Amino acid sequence: PNGEKLGTYGVIKGASSFIGATVADTEFGLEALGYEFENLILYATYIGLGTVWLAATFSRGSFASAMKISEDELFPAISPVGYPIGKKSLKESVMRKIMKSDQRKPWDKLFFNNNFSTPLTEKESGIYLAPLEMLRLAPSATNAQPWRILKVKDIIHFYVSHNSNTRDEEKLIKRVDLGIGISHFHQVALEHGLSGDFKKLSQENIQVPENTKYIISWVTKDK
């Protein structure tokens, strides 16, 4: 699609090529979209292309029309694709400062051990130190880092957290963000030879904080 006709995209100028993804409104649809789309973004970066996740700053109506997206499909994000100029512009530097894109929450705000009252230390994370650190550094809309992780023995539970006044549309984006984080976790786990499966497990014996929703778990496979 033509960049000028399809709106303004933050600090992206002259963008004419975009990738976008839609998904049905299913239980894990948005998380799966975030996971797969981030894998694509990581590959594009690997081969030298410049990309920018856009989840709230693009003209959905124009793109939905150009991509012939049906009304029952969710269309949460796109990315322009091109060759990066290199040096950040003053405008981009200011935006990154405002959005705190170069900052991340510390471990004790994101990762917990056995219960949500006990922070997980890097030492206690064991073989999952690198995957969890890469999850911590993953990008998210407005750098909100909505993921919360509970480690119980060899099981990693993934949750999405939001404020009590978060709008429904923002909650959908946070689910996409969790998928992005899970992509980082999984790719690094695989690189380190860790094997496991994603499963939905009972939360009956876990006291989950308010405004925090369980999504899925990573169950380590015995070698």
Where do the PLM segments sit?
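Acidic, surface-exposed loops and disordered segments
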Residues: 1-223
